[in-house]
């Protein structure tokens, strides 16, 4: 068998090849008129790939499916167990087998909002270390709001000519302002909607870059943490 040069290139450690980074974000979710329906997948993929490039960890791509709480009705999602059994587990098993991955960071860009509590069981079943990175969700703010549009500017996926159409009466998913069931079921969603109602959408490339950089650095930190955990 060929001996691989694991320390070659700009990598933080030869062992970093044992760590994978997997993106998880919805491809089929309305984000108002200024952002595409696969915004979550693109943001999560960008963050995951950039962290991979800066550390040398393996980029494992993006999961095709996404799950969401049943009261959030702004896109097409699948059941949590279907995503877990049909998408997430097979990808991680194949990465473990084909790439000798012993650990992974899952970058959640709103594609796995019901999966975080499954991580411990997932680690036991797959016999690998996993960190669930939720930084994008934590910092980008209301759905299809200023934060996401600002990040979209940096990625080149935002259409600023349509900002004038960003009205919740036309696109109820903006800030989830018009998603009454979701607002009634989840105080956090209602709080974010109230912020968006009050402040509107104010795109800012500086904010967008800051959000992306923060998320990338968070994933890099997780990669370093996993390296310390590996035998």
UniProtKB/Swiss-Prot annotation:
What cofactors does this protein use? Fe(2+); Zn(2+)
Question: To which pathway does this protein belong?
Answer: Cofactor biosynthesis; coenzyme F420 biosynthesis; Cofactor biosynthesis; riboflavin biosynthesis
- Tell me, which GO biological process terms does this entry list? F420-0 metabolic process; riboflavin biosynthetic process
Q: List ligand-binding residues for Fe cation 2.
A: 31, 40
The protein's UniProt keywords, in alphabetical order, are: Hydrolase, Iron, Metal-binding, Zinc
Q: Which reactions are catalysed by this chain?
A: 2-amino-5-formylamino-6-(5-phospho-D-ribosylamino)pyrimidin-4(3H)-one + H2O = 2,5-diamino-6-(1-D-ribosylamino)pyrimidin-4(3H)-one 5'-phosphate + formate + H(+)
| Gene Ontology MF annotations | 2-amino-5-formylamino-6-(5-phosphoribosylamino)pyrimidin-4(3H)-one formate-lyase activity; ferrous iron binding
- Protein EC: 3.5.1.102
Record note on cofactor: Requires one Fe(2+) ion for activity.
Which residues take part in binding Fe cation 1?
A: 29, 40, 110
Q: Which HAMAP family match?
A: FAPy_deform
Q: Which family does it belong to?
A: Belongs to the creatininase superfamily. FAPy deformylase family.
Q: How does it assemble?
A: Homodimer.
Q: Briefly, what is this protein's role?
A: Catalyzes the hydrolysis of the formamide of 2-amino-5-formylamino-6-ribosylamino-4(3H)-pyrimidinone 5'-monophosphate (FAPy) to form 2,5-diamino-6-ribosylamino-4(3H)-pyrimidinone 5'-phosphate (APy).
Which protein are we looking at? 2-amino-5-formylamino-6-ribosylaminopyrimidin-4(3H)-one 5'-monophosphate deformylase
- The source organism is Methanothermobacter marburgensis (strain ATCC BAA-927 / DSM 2133 / JCM 14651 / NBRC 100331 / OCM 82 / Marburg) (Methanobacterium thermoautotrophicum)
The gene coding this protein: arfB
């Amino acid at each position: 068998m060929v001996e691989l040069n694991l320390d070659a290139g700009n990598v933080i450690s030869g062992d970093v090849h044992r760590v994978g980074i997997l993106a998880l974000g919805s491809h089929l979710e309305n984000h108002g008129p200024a952002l595409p329906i696969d915004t979550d997948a693109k943001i999560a993929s960008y963050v995951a790939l950039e962290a991979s490039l800066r550390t040398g960890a393996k980029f494992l791509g993006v999961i095709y499916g996404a799950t969401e709480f049943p009261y959030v009705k702004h896109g097409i999602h699948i059941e949590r167990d279907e995503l877990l059994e049909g998408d997430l587990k097979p990808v991680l098993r194949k990465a473990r087998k084909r790439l000798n991955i012993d650990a992974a960071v899952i970058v959640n860009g709103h594609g796995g909002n019901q999966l975080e509590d499954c991580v411990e069981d997932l680690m036991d079943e797959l016999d690998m270390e996993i960190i669930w990175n939720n930084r994008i969700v934590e910092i980008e703010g209301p759905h299809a709001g200023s934060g996401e549009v600002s990040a979209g500017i940096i990625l080149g996926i935002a259409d600023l000519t349509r900002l004038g159409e960003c009205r919740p009466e036309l696109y109820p998913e903006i800030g989830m302002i018009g998603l009454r069931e979701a607002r009634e079921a989840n105080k956090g969603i209602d709080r974010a909607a109230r912020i968006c109602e009050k402040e509107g959408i104010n795109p800012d490339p500086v904010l967008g870059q800051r959000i992306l950089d923060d998320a990338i650095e968070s994933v890099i930190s997780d990669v370093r943490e996993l390296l310390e955990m590996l035998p």
